[in-house]
C-alpha cells in the first residue's frame, strides 16, 4: 500500500511543484482570505454587536451619519485574522520580510484595538489620546525601520529611488533611512485611518494599492524582471506578494459587509494596521514615492486635515466645510455613495499611473 501511495504521489509531483510559484500561492492566498472573510464575517459581526457599542458618531458631522449609530465597529479584526491565517498557510515562513510585515500589522492593529475599545467603553469619539497613539506608532515604526536597515543584505535595499528617473539612486545613511521608513509607515497608517470615514471608502483603495504593491514586490524579487524594468532587486521581496494578495482577498471579503449601508465598520484596528502594512511594503521594495502616487486618496485626505487645521489656527477660517475632505463633499450635498465611488475611481486612476512607472524611464 505504501508503495502504491508513493507511486501516486510521484504522479502528482508536477501538481505539488505549483506551490513553488509565487503567483500561484498569491492567488491561493487571496482566495483563502476572501472565503474565510465571507465565512467568518457574519459570526464576527454578531460577536461585535454583543458589545452594544458601535462607532461613536461625531456630533458636528453630516446629519446622515446619525443613522449609523449602533453599527458594530472593530471589523478590522476580521481582516487581520484572515490575512494572518492565509499568510501562515501559503507564505514562506523562512522569509524575514513576511514576519516583519505580519509583526507590523499586528502591532499597529493592537494600537487600533485599544483605541476602538476606549471609544466603545467610554463612548469617546476621540479614543486613545493622540500623544500615546503617536508614541506607540513611533516605537513600532522606528523598530521596523531599524530592522530593515540592519538586515539589509544588498545596497539597493537602503537606496532611495525616484520613479521615472531610474538612473537617480540616492544611498541612504542609517538615520535618513530609518526616518523615511518611520514617516512612511506611521504616515500611511494615519492616512488610511483618516480616510476610513465612509462605508467602504478606505478598504477599496487599500485593496487596489495592495494589489499594485504585490506587482512591485514580485518584480523586485525576480532577477529577470528587476533587470528588465530597471527597478531595485531586493532578494526575498517577492514573497510579499502573498501578504499583498491576502490583504486584497480579505479586503474584498470585508467590503461585502462594509459596503453602503455598512453592516460593520473597520475601526482603527483595521485602518491603522493596513496603512502601516502598505507603508512597510513600499519601504521594503523601495517604492516610497510610487506609494504616494497610488495612495493619492489617502494623501489628499491627510493634506485636507493639515490644511484645515493650519488655516484655522493662522486665520481663524476653514478652507473646507469639514475635514477630512470626504465630509466636505457630503456637506455640499453629495450622497455618500457618490463620494465613495468617485474616490474609488480616483484610486483606480492613480494606481494605474503608479503601475505605469514600471515602464516609464
From Swiss-Prot:
The chain crosses the membrane at residues 25-45, 73-93, 98-118, 139-159, 168-188, 200-220, 237-257, 264-284, 289-309, 339-359. The keyword Membrane applies. Keywords: Cell cycle, Cell division, Cell inner membrane, Cell membrane, Cell shape, Cell wall biogenesis/degradation, Magnesium, Membrane, Metal-binding, Peptidoglycan synthesis, Transferase, Transmembrane, Transmembrane helix. Its cofactor is Mg(2+). The keyword Cell cycle applies. Its EC number is 2.7.8.13. It is a multi-pass membrane protein. It is found in: Cell inner membrane. Its main location: membrane. One of its GO terms (biological process) is cell wall organization. Pathway: Cell wall biogenesis; peptidoglycan biosynthesis. One of its GO terms (cellular component) is plasma membrane. InterPro entries: Glycosyl_transferase_4, PNAcMuramoyl-5peptid_Trfase, PNAcMuramoyl-5peptid_Trfase_CS. It catalyses: UDP-N-acetyl-alpha-D-muramoyl-L-alanyl-gamma-D-glutamyl-meso-2,6-diaminopimeloyl-D-alanyl-D-alanine + di-trans,octa-cis-undecaprenyl phosphate = di-trans,octa-cis-undecaprenyl diphospho-N-acetyl-alpha-D-muramoyl-L-alanyl-D-glutamyl-meso-2,6-diaminopimeloyl-D-alanyl-D-alanine + UMP. GO terms for molecular function: metal ion binding; phospho-N-acetylmuramoyl-pentapeptide-transferase activity; UDP-N-acetylmuramoyl-L-alanyl-D-glutamyl-meso-2,6-diaminopimelyl-D-alanyl-D-alanine:undecaprenyl-phosphate transferase activity. It holds the Pfam family Glycos_transf_4. Catalyzes the initial step of the lipid cycle reactions in the biosynthesis of the cell wall peptidoglycan: transfers peptidoglycan precursor phospho-MurNAc-pentapeptide from UDP-MurNAc-pentapeptide onto the lipid carrier undecaprenyl phosphate, yielding undecaprenyl-pyrophosphoryl-MurNAc-pentapeptide, known as lipid I. Belongs to the glycosyltransferase 4 family. MraY subfamily. This is Phospho-N-acetylmuramoyl-pentapeptide-transferase. The lineage of its organism: Bacteria, Pseudomonadati, Pseudomonadota, Gammaproteobacteria, Lysobacterales. The gene is mraY.
Amino acid at each position: 500500500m505504501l508503495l502504491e501511495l508513493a507511486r501516486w504521489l510521484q504522479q502528482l509531483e508536477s501538481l505539488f511543484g505549483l506551490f513553488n510559484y509565487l503567483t500561484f500561492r498569491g492567488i491561493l492566498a487571496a482566495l483563502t482570505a476572501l472565503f474565510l472573510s465571507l465565512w467568518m464575517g457574519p459570526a464576527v459581526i454578531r460577536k461585535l454587536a454583543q458589545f452594544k457599542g458601535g462607532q461613536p458618531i461625531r456630533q458636528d458631522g453630516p446629519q446622515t451619519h446619525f443613522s449609523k449609530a449602533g453599527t458594530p465597529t472593530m471589523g478590522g479584526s476580521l481582516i487581520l485574522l484572515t490575512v494572518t491565517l492565509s499568510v501562515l498557510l501559503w507564505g514562506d515562513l523562512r522569509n524575514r520580510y513576511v514576519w516583519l510585515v505580519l509583526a507590523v500589522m499586528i502591532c499597529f492593529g493592537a494600537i487600533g484595538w485599544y483605541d476602538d475599545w476606549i471609544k466603545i467603553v467610554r463612548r469617546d469619539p476621540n479614543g486613545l489620546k493622540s500623544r500615546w497613539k503617536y508614541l506607540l506608532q513611533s516605537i513600532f515604526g522606528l523598530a521596523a525601520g531599524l530592522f530593515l536597515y540592519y538586515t539589509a543584505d544588498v545596497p539597493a535595499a537602503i537606496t532611495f529611488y525616484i520613479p521615472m528617473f531610474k538612473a537617480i539612486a540616492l544611498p541612504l545613511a542609517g538615520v535618513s533611512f530609518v526616518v523615511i521608513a518611520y514617516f512612511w509607515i506611521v504616515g500611511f497608517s494615519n492616512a488610511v485611518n483618516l480616510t476610513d470615514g465612509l462605508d467602504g471608502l478606505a478598504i477599496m483603495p487599500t485593496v487596489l494599492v495592495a494589489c499594485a504593491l504585490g506587482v512591485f514586490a514580485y518584480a523586485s524579487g525576480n532577477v529577470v524582471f528587476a533587470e528588465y524594468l530597471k527597478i531595485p532587486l531586493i532578494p526575498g521581496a517577492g514573497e510579499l506578494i502573498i501578504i499583498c494578495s491576502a490583504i486584497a482577498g480579505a479586503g474584498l471579503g470585508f467590503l461585502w459587509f462594509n459596503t453602503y449601508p455598512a453592516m460593520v465598520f473597520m475601526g482603527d484596528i483595521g485602518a491603522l494596521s493596513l496603512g502601516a502594512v502598505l507603508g512597510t511594503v513600499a519601504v521594503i521594495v523601495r517604492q516610497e514615492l510610487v506609494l504616494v502616487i497610488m495612495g493619492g486618496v489617502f494623501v489628499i485626505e491627510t493634506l485636507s486635515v493639515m490644511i484645515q487645521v493650519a488655516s484655522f489656527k493662522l486665520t481663524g477660517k476653514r478652507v473646507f466645510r469639514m475635514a477630512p475632505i470626504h465630509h466636505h463633499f457630503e456637506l455640499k450635498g453629495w450622497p455618500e455613495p457618490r463620494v465613495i465611488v468617485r474616490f474609488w475611481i480616483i484610486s483606480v486612476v492613480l494606481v494605474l499611473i503608479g503601475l505605469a512607472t514600471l515602464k516609464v524611464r
